[in-house]
Amino acid sequence: MAGVLAGDCSFGESGVSSYSRNSNEKQDEVARWYFGRKEIEENSPSRLDSIDLKKETYLRKSYCTFLQDLGMRLKVPQVTIATAIIFCHRFFIRQSHARNDRRTIATVCMFLAGKVEETPRPLKDVIVVSYEIIHKKDPTTAQKIKQKEVYEQQKELILNGEKIVLSTLGFDFNVYHPYKPLVEAIKKFKVAQNALAQVAWNFVNDGLRTSLCLQFKPHHIAAGAIFLAAKFLKVKLPSDGEKVWWQEFDVTPRQLEDVSNQMLELYEQNRVPASQVSEVESSVGGGSAHHVGSRPSARLTHEHSNSDNLGGSTKATQNRSNDNGSGEAGSVITEQKGERDTETKDSMHTESHPAHKSRSGVEAPGEDKIEKAGAHFPEDDKSRIVGTADVTVSQSPKDIKMFRDKVKAKLEAKKVQGEKTRKKDLVDEDDLIERELEDVELAVEDDKDIQNKSSMGTEHGEILDGNNLVVNTEEGEMIDDVSSTMPSRKRKMESPCEKQLGEGKRRHDNSENVEEGQKTNPGGSSHSYGDREPRRHSQER
């Protein structure tokens, strides 16, 4: 019988294509374990016993965390833990939490899962470890369980519970997991295989704490996990021609969206305060009420430290999971990494599924950041400064300060530019005055020579532009063009002697010598002009 059960489970771990092709014969057998979400949330046996959805959701997470911890201590593969969780989900979709102690049922499911997956653990070990976890706040727990009376009582409880679980499950041990379809599909992608497999694997493990396995087939869950993992890693999954990657899983876009959203909902839920946990515990009948004081508040971060450590606290557990087709992508996820992963998944969900956006600040398990899966907004996108006429300023003080600084910088630049312009204008004006005086000195020359020089200036493209004089020095010559474009106020002529006298005073502080030089030496003007020409030429450059 064990061989038959193992063969069924191995069949359930087949690849994506073979799963879709060969599992048709088994669909009728497992169809009774698939329900609609509305049916699960509104018509469950626990709801009929006045346990609301919030309490039942907490109880579901509670026994999943318990099973993860129990499996790690028993050092069983992750696939065995997953099988035990699915057995527990199936049991409580048919039975009420008010009539059954979830920890006792979970212990029975772990014992059964070990036998189904051919990784059995002795009943004594299962009982002892389970008892220690349930009463972990009691320092005398290790001594109590060694007492024969206590042990026999627990043993009888587990064996009676096994009968109830077997009858409730209808002796149906066919369980299909998303692990193998997940790994087989990622092998085909050839894109960030290791990272993608690890993150998607963790999403599958976290999804065990929801009712996804009661709503969707394993390959649908695998597709949702790969979708979220790709979003987190920002990996573009390849497509084969017109066939996109998710079509390999025989899943519709609506199913893919539903699976992804429900996985993300797990991380959005607020932490349950200790008072609410106590209320939930006390409201549930059976033997669970007297354990209220020993249970901490329901924190997703704490649950993550148990559920995301794949295959236990050592790598040996992962190696053993290879026998069940689940160890190919096994990894050890630290608790610190789980805390860091919260923001990534929240941001991933914010980008992909705004309808389920939550700002509860839950330290969610899983792979990160969803780097925030994403989302950094550059400041340029928040507040773009196009100009004073078209400015979009955000409400943050930082953006307002940036805008003010930029405006101030622009005003400073304009001010500096204006000062440079005025300075240049002054230099040019002085230069023009000097040129005018020099032209007066040249007045003693023939009019013909002046006209020739004027024509030469025209040929060389001299341009007088208001206050700026631009000289074309194509041939290395400086040509003076005293044209009619000069301002009339600058061309106002007095007597040549007076202007020469003024120029002499400014340059030599000896007006008499200059005046005599102009009279006695006709060539003095030419000589004086020649001496000043190189200096003016250098200023022009």
Swiss-Prot record:
Bias type Basic and acidic residues, positions? 336-354, 493-511, 529-541
Please provide, alphabetically and separated by semicolons, the GO molecular function terms listed in this UniProt record.
Answer: cyclin-dependent protein serine/threonine kinase regulator activity
Compositionally biased residues, Polar residues: 307-325, 519-528
Tell me the domain of life.
Eukaryota
List, in alphabetical order, the GO biological process terms annotated in this UniProt record.
cell division; regulation of transcription by RNA polymerase II; response to virus; trichome morphogenesis
Q: Is Cell division one of the keywords UniProt gives this record?
A: yes
| Sections of the chain in a coiled coil | none
Keywords on this record?
Cell cycle, Cell division, Cyclin, Phosphoprotein
Q: Where is this region: Disordered?
A: 277-366, 445-541
Q: What SUPFAM superfamilies does the record tag this protein with?
A: Cyclin-like
> Which InterPro entries does this entry report, sorted A to Z?
Cyclin-like_dom, Cyclin-like_sf, Cyclin/Ssn8, Cyclin_N
Residues bearing the modification Phosphoserine: S396
Which Pfam families does its entry note?
Cyclin_N, CycT2-like_C
User: Belongs to which family?
Assistant: Belongs to the cyclin family. Cyclin T subfamily.
Question: What protein does this entry describe?
Answer: Cyclin-T1-4
What is the organism of origin for this protein?
A: Arabidopsis thaliana (Mouse-ear cress)
This protein's gene is called: CYCT1-4
